[in-house]
Amino acid sequence: SKLPGGFDNVNVTGGEPTLRKDLLEICDVLYPKSKTLEISTNGLKPDLLIPIVKKYPNIKIRFSLEGKEDTNNLIRGENDGFNKKVEGMKKLIDAGGKDLGFAFVVQDENVHELSFVYDLTKKMGIELSTSTLHNAWQFHKNDNYHYDRLRSAKAMESLITNMLDTFGEWRATVNPI
């Protein structure tokens, strides 16, 4: 391919990447040309990602997850999306994926479930990525205005505290004082 190499990060994103029949071939071209290749997906078709994860276990895959079942379904317009994504992520873990996680877009409608999703990722042994204070047309808003910033700040503070506690627990096992 004529595409140059040396990219730090390449993210294959949407629309929805798993709608492409040639997603594995796209990964075949991009994987050797970047330090990190990521697929950002809604996570509803994990079986299409299994061959990619088996071929490239270090590929970074993030499923969009906006909270518990009802919240995720409301924001994403999905039916049973939460369970499908959790079960799908387990399939990718079983397939040998090493850089897996959920992506959470913080907004007024779901900020109260941020710690829940973080705890879920800890239990599953996967990552959590967040995009904060964001809304847009795909979240049924056009003003891109976050209304309850104080509530979001408190939720982020709680998440950071939880993460620091987790780090402290981990460090105590690695380097006991």
Please state what every model-predicted region is.
Residues 1-58:
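Conserved Radical SAM active-site core
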Residues 1, 28-29, 33, 55, ...:
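Radical SAM enzyme [4Fe-4S]-AdoMet core and its adjacent flexible, acidic
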